[in-house]
Amino acid sequence: MALAVRLLPRLLLSRPLPGWAARLRTLSSAEVKRPLSGLCYLCRRRLGSGAAPFPRVSWASAALALSARGPQRPLLSPLEVASTLPTFPSCPRRTYSTEEQPQQRQKTKMIILGFSNPINWVRTRIYSFLIWAYFDQEFSITEFSEGAKQAFAHVSKLLSQCKFDLLEELVAKETLHVLKEKVTSLPDNHKNALAADIDEIVYTSTGDISIYYDEKGRKFVNILMCFWYLTSANIPSEAISGARVFQVKLGDQNVETKQLLSASYEFQREFTQGVKPDWTIARIEHPKLLE
């Protein structure tokens, strides 16, 4: 019985299997062991196990063993390495330089601090609230000041170019008639000084706000705006009282002279019911330029 139990697995594994199934058999211990297992790579000696001493091999014997195997060809020769590497177009480059890199030109920014009269500031805020409460719910003195700044830059440019026909809907008729007589008689350098670039306007201030009714019951609001701007027009400094001269450095040698001028524009709007909600310029003043 014991012999049958020991032979049964071998009989089952040695029987031919149907179809494509492979035939399994038990491998012997000699077949399982690799021929080079347990051998040293240098001296081909069998490595001991347990308490057997490990054979010591000197560097001389190791060198003799390697030389006995014969010269070995390297995996890649220097020429083959160079040929296998991809070739890229050579670009001229400078790794070190003693020359100083040119520094970028820094822009000079002018900051002008203006301090308004505290009484005038409080008065302006009170009238702004009255306009918002009784006339226009969308009115804001901050937004109005920004719009007045853009209008000043646009109107002053047209005024310096004597394009009075384009100013008919922006300036009051009486004011425009007076401006025609004054501007046409100005020299060219004074005409150029009338134009204010929006980027050259350095300060804006609210001068005065007034609310009044006329005899017919119409409601009006007037807001006086004061502007300070820089101009490059060639005007003698003694020709304009109160003007300030600034020298703006553009580079290492170029120096541009600019003058700080002021102008006052009074904006007017009628809040009578049924009237177009448009702001017009009722007064324009350029000290010493338009007199």
Swiss-Prot record:
It is found in: Mitochondrion matrix. Promotes sorting of SMDT1/EMRE in mitochondria by ensuring its maturation. Interacts with the transit peptide region of SMDT1/EMRE precursor protein in the mitochondrial matrix, leading to protect it against protein degradation by YME1L1, thereby ensuring SMDT1/EMRE maturation by the mitochondrial processing peptidase (PMPCA and PMPCB). GO terms for molecular function: ribosome binding. It comes from the Eukaryota. Keywords: Mitochondrion, Transit peptide. Signal peptide: none annotated. This is m-AAA protease-interacting protein 1, mitochondrial. The keyword Transit peptide applies. Residues 1-96 form a transit peptide. One of its GO terms (biological process) is protein insertion into mitochondrial membrane. It comes from Bos taurus. GO terms for cellular component: mitochondrial inner membrane; mitochondrial matrix. Disulfide bonds: none annotated. Its main location: mitochondrion. Interacts with AFG3L2. Interacts with SPG7. Interacts with SMDT1/EMRE (via the N-terminal transit peptide); interaction is direct and takes place before maturation of SMDT1/EMRE.
